[in-house]
């Protein structure tokens, strides 16, 4: 299955970010804690070079806690400031302002020596579609400053948000990159909802998810759907359809409905806390 989604507005958004980065002290990059590496746009490292960097691993409530701890150590070792959080419940949000100040302390000291007082840290918030940038900004600012939605591509245009005397945020549209060199990256992005479902083969996506869960989280499908995990992936999807009574009007099993149900329940955390990639595997 081939994954690719790079609509024209993303090219325009990237050009705007390249222009706006000149105004920025700090790049705050949101990633999905279930796929912390695959949900990083590789263009951001080039865009944000010579800028202070903070990685926020959002949706940590849906991710495997041990994996999140390992990813946090992985990124810190590479020189990033890192926070794991759940922007929706605000869990993990309290420390962010202090970490922003810590990350930018050299800049603030330079300002002080130059006699520049009370100039706020300017941070650009970046991330791929559907990682929760708008929800993070709304939670952080304490009010609905940015549009939110559960479909990739909702936030558009330039938005500066003054959080306090100390911090200003520039929200940016979620952008992917033109080509996924590794189709496993595309698969993971599709599973978390960063690629529009309308262009995906949901049945094949569900089969890939079942294959992963059988090997990495054995027993989770049996517990949720009362299926026998020794079966083939397609047979397991059939079992899920039977368990959840996914039936067509003609009385046949509705595999597409079962596939969509499985993916939705994974995305919503109903299967448990699951991470789709681990740092030690990436290093091999």
Can you name each region flagged by the protein language model?
Residues 1-26, 34-43, 47-53, 66, ...:
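Helix-rich effector regions associated with P-loop NTPase G domains
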Residues 61-126, 145:
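Canonical P-loop GTPase G-domain recognition
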Residues 107-111, 138, 144-150, 216-221:
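Short, structured loop/turn "capping" segments at alpha-beta junctions
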Residues 122-142, 146, 172:
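Glycine-rich phosphate-binding P-loop
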Residues 31-34, 60, 140, 173:
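Anionic group-transfer/hydrolysis microenvironments
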Residues 51-61:
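Active-site cofactor/substrate anionic-group-binding motifs, chiefly glycine-
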């Amino acid at each position: 299955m081939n994954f690719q989604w790079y609509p024209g507005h993303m090219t325009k958004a990237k050009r705007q970010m390249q222009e706006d980065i000149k105004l920025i002290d700090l790049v705050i990059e949101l990633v999905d804690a279930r796929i912390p590496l695959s949900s990083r746009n590789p263009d951001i490292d080039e865009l944000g070079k010579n800028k202070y960097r903070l990685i926020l691993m959002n949706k940590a409530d849906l991710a495997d806690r041990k994996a999140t701890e390992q990813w946090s150590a992985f990124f810190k070792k590479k020189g990033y400031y890192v926070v794991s959080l759940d922007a929706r419940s605000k869990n993990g949000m309290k420390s962010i302002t202090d970490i922003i100040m810590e990350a930018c302390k050299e800049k603030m000291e330079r300002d002080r020596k130059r006699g520049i007082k009370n100039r706020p840290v300017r941070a650009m918030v970046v991330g791929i579609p559907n990682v929760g940038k708008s929800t993070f900004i709304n939670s952080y600012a304490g009010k609905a400053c940015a549009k939110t939605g559960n479909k990739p591509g909702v936030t558009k245009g330039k938005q500066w948000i003054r959080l306090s005397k100390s911090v200003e945020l520039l929200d940016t549209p979620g952008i992917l990159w033109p080509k996924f060199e590794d189709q496993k990256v595309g698969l993971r992005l599709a599973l978390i909802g960063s690629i529009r479902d309308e262009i995906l083969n949901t049945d094949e996506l569900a089969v890939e998810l079942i294959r992963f869960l059988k090997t990495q989280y054995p027993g989770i499908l049996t517990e949720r759907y009362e299926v026998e995990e020794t079966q083939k992936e397609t047979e397991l999807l059939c079992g899920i359809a039977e368990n959840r009574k996914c039936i067509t009007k003609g009385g046949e099993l509705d595999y597409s409905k079962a596939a969509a149900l499985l993916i939705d329940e994974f995305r919503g955390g109903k299967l448990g806390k699951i991470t789709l990639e681990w740092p030690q595997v990436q290093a091999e």
